[in-house]
Amino acid sequence: RAQRMGRPDYAIKCFTEALAIQDDFETMSYLSQVYIQTNALSEAHELLERMAKLEPEHTSTFLTLANVCYLQEDYQAMAKAAQKAIEIEEGNAMAHYLLGRAKQGMDDGIMSIAHLTKAIVLKDDFTEARLLRAEALTKMKQYNEAMEDIDAILAQDADDESALLLRGKIKEATGDAGAAEADYCHVTELNPFNEQGFLYLGQLYIEQKKLPEAIALFDEAIELNPNFAQAYHERGRAKLLNGDKDGSVEDTKIALELNPKEVQAFNGQYGNQSNERQPNVLGL
C-alpha cells in the first residue's frame, strides 16, 4: 500500500522487515521494483541476484537484472544475466535484445548485430531492436543495411524521432547535408523538447560554418530548457568560431556548472578552435 501511495521509503522499510522474518520471492520482487524506482541500483542488483538463486528458473528475474546492469553500465554482468535468460527461454526476444545491447556496450558490434537479428526474427515488429541494430550497423559504416531497419521503423511510425535522427546522421555521413537538415528540423518541429534534435542540427550548422544560425538555434534550445548543458557548450563553440570569445567563455562556464562531469570533454575544445563534432547518445 505504501508503494502505491508514493511512499517508497516506508515501502522499503516494510518489505525489508518482512524479509528479515522470512525470505519470500514475491516480497523480494516488490522490493526490487521500489529499489529500481528510487534509483537504488546496487541494492536492486544484489536483491535480484538473491532472487535468481532462490528461484533460478524465472526468466523475468534475469531480464530485470540485465536492465539494472545496463543502468549501472556493467555490460559484462548484463550479458551474463541476458545469457542466463536465453538458457531458460531460448525464444525470448527481449533476452536476445538485451544481450545485443550488452554486446554493443562492450564494443562487440558483430555479436551485437547477431543477437539483435535473433530478437527481430523472433519479433518482427521489435522497433527497439531494429533501431539498435541500425545504430550498430551505422557505427560499422554499413549504411545501406542500417537504412533497411530505419525504413522498416518509419513504415510503422513515420514520426519515430530516434529513427529520423539516425537517418539524418546517415545522410550527413554520406554527404547529403540537406536531407540531414530536413530530418533534424522535422524532429525539432515534432518535439521542441527533443534535445538531440537541436544538438544535431546545431552541430551541422557549425560544420557548415552557418554560425549565426547555430547560435540562434541554441538560443531557442536554451530558452526551452535553461539547464541544457550541451546547448551552452555548443553555443560557446559557435560563438568562439564566430569571434565572440567573451560569450564563448561565459557559455562554457555555464555548461560546466550545469554538468561538471563533462569537464574532461570540454577541455581543449576551445583552445584550438576545433571544429570536431562532439560524441552523442547514439555513439556516432
Label every model-predicted segment:
Residues F25-T27, T59-S60, Y75, A93-M94, ...:
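Helix-start (N-cap) detector for alpha-helical repeat units in TPR-like alpha-solenoids
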Residues Y30, T64, L98, L132, ...:
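Canonical tetratricopeptide repeat
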